[in-house]
Amino acid sequence: MGPEALSSLLLLLLVASGDADMKGHFDPAKCRYALGMQDRTIPDSDISASSSWSDSTAARHSSDGDGAWCPAGSVFPKEEEYLQVDLQRLHLVALVGTQGRHAGGLGKEFSRSYRLRYSRDGRRWMGWKDRWGQEVISGNEDPEGVVLKDLGPPMVARLVRFYPRADRVMSVCLRVELYGCLWRDGLLSYTAPVGQTMYLSEAVYLNDSTYDGHTVGGLQYGGLGQLADGVVGLDDFRKSQELRVWPGYDYVGWSNHSFSSGYVEMEFEFDRLRAFQAMQVHCNNMHTLGARLPGGVECRFRRGPAMAWEGEPMRHNLGGNLGDPRARAVSVPLGGRVARFLQCRFLFAGPWLLFSEISFISDVVNNSSPALGGTFPPAPWWPPGPPPTNFSSLELEPRGQQPVAKAEGSPTAILIGCLVAIILLLLLIIALMLWRLHWRRLLSKAERRVLEEELTVHLSVPGDTILINNRPGPREPPPYQEPRPRGNPPHSAPCVPNGSALLLSNPAYRLLLATYARPPRGPGPPTPAWAKPTNTQAYSGDYMEPEKPGAPLLPPPPQNSVPHYAEADIVTLQGVTGGNTYAVPALPPGAVGDGPPRVDFPRSRLRFKEKLGEGQFGEVHLCEVDSPQDLVSLDFPLNVRKGHPLLVAVKILRPDATKNARNDFLKEVKIMSRLKDPNIIRLLGVCVQDDPLCMITDYMENGDLNQFLSAHQLEDKAAEGAPGDGQAAQGPTISYPMLLHVAAQIASGMRYLATLNFVHRDLATRNCLVGENFTIKIADFGMSRNLYAGDYYRVQGRAVLPIRWMAWECILMGKFTTASDVWAFGVTLWEVLMLCRAQPFGQLTDEQVIENAGEFFRDQGRQVYLSRPPACPQGLYELMLRCWSRESEQRPPFSQLHRFLAEDALNTV
C-alpha cells in the first residue's frame, strides 16, 4: 500500500469516526490552568496599567511591593483605570481570580466589582458579557479573600484588561490571576448569517447569542461565538447543557425558507497559512422537528484577503444514517489545501440546519515554503507556536499545577440559590416589620472581624471562594497602611489615616464612545435589532493620521466579511468649536507649527454679527472688521474695497474648556496656519494672550454653497427635467459652465490638501463658501451649524458623522484617506449639479445608508448609487461613479478631477 493510499485511508477513518462523535474536540471544563500571574510565568514586561500608585511591578503579581496594583486615579465615576495582561498568544480564558491588597496584612483596599475587556489583535477591544448580557462581575468583600469567577462564555483573547469599579471615591487595589489554556485552532473569526427563531409549541431561539463581532444587515462578522466555544449541543436542540438559558441556546440555526440559494454560506479567517485536512461540524438531526444534517458541503480557499478564491472548490456529499435523530459530528475532508480564509456553503437537506460547533484539523504552513509557489501575507505579530499534534483547538499547559475544578451546575447549587433567595426575602419582611434598632442588631450580628495578620494565596487551588490564613493574628485589627507614594522607598512603620476618605487625582479628560452599562436581560435571548457598525474608540484630540500606502503591520481584514468599525474605534470628526478638523499626517514634534508664525489679532477690532454654530467647548461667530487696510501688520487680502468691512469667521474657545480642549484648539491653530491656497479658507490671526482664545479665518459674503445654489435656477431650461419646481424661474440663475467652474475650484482646493496629505473628512457644499465672481473656498465649520444637523448621523448621542457623504470604508472601518475625500467630492459634485435641491440618498434612512455601505463591501451587486442629476451629461456622471469605486485605488486623484472639470467637462455628452 503506497503512502497516498495510506493517507487516504487514515482520512476516511477520521471522517467515519467523526460521524459518531467529536471525540477529538476540546473540553472547556479542562481548560482551567493558571496562566502565570502568581508564579511570574507572565513577565513584568507583559503587565501594564493605565496608571499605578506605585512603580513596583511586583505588586501586580502578588503580595510583594505594595501588595497589589492600585491605580493612581480614582475609578469613580468614569471607570477608566485598568490593569492589562498580555498573554503574547491567543488563549481561551475560562476563569479569573481577584484579591485585594496584601501589604503584610496591613492593606484594606479591594474591588467589590469589575469589568473585563479583551482583544485578539491589540486594535479592537471587546467587553466581556455573560450569557444574559451583564458586564459587571462581582468581586471581593474583603482584602484577604480570593474570589474565582467562571467566565460563561469563555473568551478567546491575547490581551485582557481588568477595570475595577466603585460606587464612590475610594481606594481600590487588585491582584489577579487568569486561568485557561492556549488556543491552538488558529481561528480568528467567522462570518455567518444571523441565527433565526423556530416556532414550535414554544419559541426556540437559534441565534449566536455570545458572538463578539458585529451584526449588520442580517450578517455577523469579525468575531467568535457559540460555534467555537467547545460546547456540543444535545440530541434535543430544545434542551441545553447550560442552566437558566432559553430553548435552543446550544445551537445556531437557519431556515431553508429564508435562503433562496438553498445553502448557508460561512467564511472563516485564521491567524496564518494552514494546510487543512478536515473540518468537523457538529449538527443536529432531530428530523421530526425539521432539523436535518447538511446535504453537502462546498468549500473554497484563498491565502490572503485581497486574493481570489483558488482552484476548484472542495465538494463533499454527506451520507450515512440520516434517519437516526441523534446529533453528531460530520467530517468534511479538505484535502490538505493551503489557505488563511475558507468559504464554505452548507446545502439544505431539510427545513432547518442546526450547528453547535465547528472545528478544523490543520497544520501551520511556512509562508516562504517553495511548495507554495511564492510568499504570502505575514503571520500575525504574536509569536508562532508548534503545529498541533492532535485534533484539538486547545493545548493544555499544566505548568506543573492541577487545573482549577469547575463548579458543577448541579441541583445542589440550584437548591442553595433558592435558599439564599428565601432567606433574603425573609430578611426584607423582617426589616419592614421591626424597628430600626432591631434592624441594626441584625446587621451587627452579620458583621465579622478579620483576625488574621498575613495571607499567602495561590489562585490555582480549586474552589469558588478561597480564604487561606497562614497564622493567627493579633486580637486587635492591624492599623491601616496606605500604598506607598511613587518614588518613596519601602518602610516598615505603618501609616495611620486621619479618618477622611482618600481623594485620588482624577485622570485626564477623555471622551469614550463605548457604552458599558446595559439593562439586565431576562432568561430570553436578546431582541433582534439593527446593529450599527461603530468604531468605539475616541481620542482626546481630534487629529487623526490618514492611511499611507505601504505594507500594513497586520494583514487587512477579509473582503467577504463586513469589517468592524474598529471598537475601540469611533473617530470623532468634530473639533472643540463644533466644526470638523483635518486629519493630518504623522509629523515629528513641532513640525505642525513649521508654517508662518501666527499673527496676534486685536480683539477690539472684531464686531459681532451673528452666531454661525457651536460645539462642546466653543462657538463660531460671524464678525466684521472695519477698515482692515489699517491693520498693516496682518496679511489680509487686498481685494477688500476701502471703506467696506471684512467678513471673518471667529472660532471662540469658552473659558471653562478643559485642558485637553485648549490643547486641541492650539493644534488646530497650528494646522490652519499651514494652509495657503486661494480655494481654502486662511487663518488671518489669533487672540491667545487671554481668554477666551480665538482664531480668525476668512469668510465669504455670499455664505455657504448649499444655501447659495438652492436659491438659484439653472439657466438652461431646455435641459429635460432640470432641477426646479416646474414653475417659472424666480430669482437669480446660474449656468451649467459656471457650475463646472464651481466644482473645479473645489477640486483645486482638495488637490492642495492632498499634496499636504491632509484629509478633510467632511467635504460637502455646506462646507464651501462663495465669494465675489463665484469664488469658492473650502471651510470646516458646517458641522457646527444647527441648520445642517439633519446631514449628520449621531452615534450614541455624542459623535456625529456625515454618513451620506462618507465612503463605505469610513463608515465600516473608520478609515479616512484622500481616496475617501474623493468619494465625498463625488457626492459634492452631485449636490452642485442638483443645485442642492435634494439630500444625498434622501429616500434612505440613516440605517439603510449604513446597510448600503455593507453592500459596497460585500460587492454582490446590491449596492445603491446616487442617480444621475437631470442636467448632468453621461460622461460627467461616469466620473462620479469612478469617485464611488469600491476599491480606493481605482478612484481618480484630485489632480485628474481638477483637470477634467477645468478643461474637458464642457465637451462631455
From Swiss-Prot:
Membrane-spanning segments: 414-434
Active-site residues per Swiss-Prot or TrEMBL entry: D762 (proton acceptor)
GO molecular function, one term: ATP binding
Amino acids binding Ca(2+) 2: Q226, D229, V231, S356, E357
InterPro entries according to UniProt: DDR1-2_DS-like (IPR048525), FA58C (IPR000421), Galactose-bd-like_sf (IPR008979), Kinase-like_dom_sf (IPR011009), Prot_kinase_dom (IPR000719), RTK (IPR050122), Ser-Thr/Tyr_kinase_cat_dom (IPR001245), Tyr_kinase_AS (IPR008266)
Chain positions found as Phosphotyrosine: Y480, Y509, Y516, Y736, Y788, Y792, Y793
Binding residue positions for Ca(2+) 1: N207, Q226, Y249, Y251
A Gene Ontology biological process term: cell surface receptor protein tyrosine kinase signaling pathway
Domain Protein kinase positions: 606-901
Post-translational modification: Autophosphorylated in response to fibrillar collagen binding.
Annotated catalysed reactions: L-tyrosyl-[protein] + ATP = O-phospho-L-tyrosyl-[protein] + ADP + H(+)
SMART domains from the UniProt entry: FA58C, TyrKc
Region (Disordered): 45-65, 466-495
In-chain residues carrying the UniProt-annotated modification Phosphoserine: S627
Signal peptide from the UniProt entry: 1-18
Pro residues bias: start-end ranges: 475-492
Domain F5/8 type C, residue spans: 31-181
Motif (PPxY motif): 477-480
Documented EC number(s): 2.7.10.1
Known partners and oligomeric status: Homodimer. Interacts (via PPxY motif) with WWC1 (via WW domains) in a collagen-regulated manner. Forms a tripartite complex with WWC1 and PRKCZ, but predominantly in the absence of collagen. Interacts (tyrosine phosphorylated) with SHC1. Interacts with SRC. Interacts with MYH9. Interacts with CDH1. Interacts with PTPN11. Interacts with NCK2.
Domain-related comment: The Gly/Pro-rich domains may be required for an unusual geometry of interaction with ligand or substrates.
Protein name (record): Epithelial discoidin domain-containing receptor 1
Biological source species: Pan troglodytes (Chimpanzee)
